[in-house]
């Protein structure tokens, strides 16, 4: 009985200690708590610029949302700028609309 209880405790601890790699969306913290402002270059539109910014920090893609580059599927170690949840929801919704 004690051995099986110990096995259960060890199993629970093991499960809790497993680090799960998750992806998240947001405005990446590029420098000093600020994200990258959308801009065009000779080669890129605003959208292409943001895609390049996001991919350079291991994001899946990005777009220009409310004047700033918003990235999708950023790695956990990438800092993101704190913004209201409604802003994040709007930018995520905007991406879903583009995919349809």
Curated annotation (Swiss-Prot):
Subcellular locations according to the entry: Secreted
Signal peptide range: 1-22
Principal subcellular localisation of the protein: secreted
A cellular component annotation (GO) from this entry: extracellular region
The keyword Signal is assigned to this record: yes
Comment text on domains: Has the structural arrangement of an alpha-helix connected to antiparallel beta-sheets by disulfide bonds (CS-alpha/beta).
Family: Belongs to the long (4 C-C) scorpion toxin superfamily. Sodium channel inhibitor family.
Name of the protein in question: Putative sodium channel toxin Ts26
Organism of origin: Tityus serrulatus
Lineage start: Eukaryota, Metazoa, Ecdysozoa, Arthropoda, Chelicerata
């Amino acid at each position: 009985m004690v051995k099986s209880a110990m096995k259960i405790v060890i199993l629970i601890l093991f499960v809790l200690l497993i680090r799960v790699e998750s992806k998240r969306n947001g405005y990446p913290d590029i420098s000093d708590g600020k994200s990258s402002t959308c801009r065009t270059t000779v080669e890129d539109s605003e959208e292409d610029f943001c895609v390049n910014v996001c991919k350079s920090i291991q994001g899946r893609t990005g777009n220009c949302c409310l004047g700033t580059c918003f990235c999708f599927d950023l790695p956990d170690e990438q800092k993101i700028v704190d913004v209201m949840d409604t802003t994040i929801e709007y930018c995520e919704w905007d991406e879903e609309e583009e995919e349809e």
